Structure formats: C-alpha cells, structure tokens
C-alpha cells in the first residue's frame, strides 16, 4: 500500500495545484476556450492574457498527469485486491454499505450546483455516472428536457446510479437540479447542461419515465 499512498499523495498535490490555477481563470472570468485576442488580433486589455495563457498551459499538462496517475492507482489497487477471496470482498462491501451515510440529504451542506458548473466548465473534470437511453412521451423526464444520449453527472448531490432510485423515491414532487453532458465540442471538452427535474406520478410506470444505464 506504500505505492498507493505515494501515488495518491501526488494526485492530491496535482488536484490542489489545479484548484489554484482554476482560481486564476475564475478571477479573470474566462474558461479554457475564451478568446484572448480582439477581432483585430491584439491581446485583450480587459484581462490578464499572459497569466491566463500560463495557467491554461499548466492545466492541460496537469490534467494529463492526473489521468496517468489515476491509471497507475487503478492498477495498484487491482493488485492489492486480487489477493482477496470473494468472501472477504463481499464482507468488505457489506461493511462499506453499513458505514455509508443515511439517505442522501436534499439540502446537503457541501452541495452547490453553481460551483460545480463553474469548476467543471473550466477544468472539464466531470465524470458521468449513467446514460439516458430512452425517454417516454409526456413523462417527467421529457418535461425536464432530458434527451436520449444525455450523460448524467449529478442529480442534486447523487453521483451513483445505485443510489438514485432511493433518492428519487424520497424526493417525489420536489424540484431537483440535474447536471449532464450533452455532447462534446470539437476539442473534446464537455457541453454541460443544467436542468430541473421533478419526479412525480404520471400515466406511465415509475416516477421519471426514462431508462438509465
């Protein structure tokens, strides 16, 4: 596990540095794609162009390093857990489930959709947890604007497909913030969309009227 700890430490250091660089972009109110030149081809005078360029370059480099570290960490963990028996893994899963928090809180203190969107647009570090592969006509999902192919990133503070059914059942007729990916730009960055979803009974089955996988 020493190797894992070293890799995890490096990963956290990179994430801290990315947050600092993200602050530079947030301060200048720009993203990774905001034009830095005027229509005449001159550097814009309303922003700190040199600082932004430096931050962007370092962000790109660190994002690549971060992905490589995640791959290395995954391989290390696979080696560690490969020695466990199925029985011990099952026991670990049960322990983990028992230690998890109570049903997700609708007003979680650490949840802030605007902050998530701002940070995600700048660094593009969003990871969807499921994909919409069908939407029924006149369903709550269609009312909210969900489309086939949408990749869900957050439903309020839920980021796990296994937790979503219980959360939806506990929040019937409540308006939930949804952050999703709807396609990708030419440079590979995500197109983020924010929707309002209200689970409720309708003429079809379920509370959403869509299928997720």
Curated annotation (Swiss-Prot):
Domain PDZ: 120-184
Stretch forming the signal peptide: none
Keyword Ribonucleoprotein among UniProt keywords: no
Keyword set, alphabetical order: Chaperone, Coiled coil, Cytoplasm, Nucleus
GO cellular component, one term: cytoplasm
Coiled-coil annotated spans: 1-82
Keyword Coiled coil on entry: yes
PANTHER family found in the cross-reference section: 26S PROTEASOME NON-ATPASE REGULATORY SUBUNIT 9 (PTHR12651:SF1)
Protein name, UniProt field: Probable 26S proteasome regulatory subunit p27
